[in-house]
Amino acid sequence: MSLAVSAVCFFILIVFWAVLYLLSRDTLAHLDLPAGQLFGPQDAESKEISKLAVAALNKRLRASAVKHEKLPWKERVLVLRETMDSFFSGAEIVSTLTAVDAGGVLAEWVTAPGVDVSRRLLYIHGGAFFAGSPKSHRVLTSKLSEITNSAVLAIDYRLTPEHSRIACVDDCRASYDWMLKNSPEGVDNLAPTAVFVAGDSAGGNLTLSFLNLIRDNTRR
């Protein structure tokens, strides 16, 4: 058997065992919602409010896209980022915002009045990996702090195309490790009583990727 044929056979064997290994890992299927169950408002009034809000956001985003569609792509990205950050700029929130350096990642603590800061939630915003920030999601993170009775750490992870997607995951890891040792009140030598990771859209994708990283590296 020639050296080239042996190399091909060896490569196929490696791929075969790699596939078997990946298929044998925990799929996290036990965390899925029951078939047919949707995460969202259930009553008619809330569904209508949600529908109108989404329509208003889409209209504003499309208007911005049309207005700047002739710009070079890099300039258009900057405009879309500014537009997204300004979506809820006039909205009132009840939470306190505290800017921090979370292990080298710019972030902000979002803490609703009276929440238990030993309960911490890492929030990873959406925005197609190239837009969004803690500022664009403050209405959401403030409400999350309220309903989960926890301090929310919203991170400003590095975005594409200036950075690679793996940089996004690295920022999630660094800020998560920092969050385990810090609270809105400063360095915390006590382990948090509860830890959550959540995100929307691209942030939801990063959440799943990061949770698998935690699982494979035996992190909390």
Task: State where each predicted segment sits.
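Short, low-complexity Ser/Thr-rich regulatory SLiMs
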Residues: 109-114, 159
